[in-house]
Amino acid sequence: IEGNLVKYITRHYKKNGKEDLEKAYHYLTLGDTFNCYWLAPKNISRSFFIEELNRYANANNITELEYSVIYECLIGDRNYGMRVLRTLIDNYDEYYKK
């Protein structure tokens, strides 16, 4: 589920735009429905995970808000991450007008 979150957030610029962010949100709600949540492996430190997420975000031009969604949904406050994603979807044209 979280893999699809990352995939759709990363590719939305190049593929289906707002529809991809809506798919990411859909997968998060599925995770909630089925109580299916990703847990970081115990042998991976939080700092290592953050370093790798930063590297991934830089390599894929992830915006600060998109980064926040991924970070919060994976190792932070999932509900907050979902609210940020919902805001990105609801304000897609305004936020991504470039």
Regions picked out by a protein language model, each given a short descriptive name:
Residues 1-98:
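Intrinsically disordered, low-complexity regulatory regions
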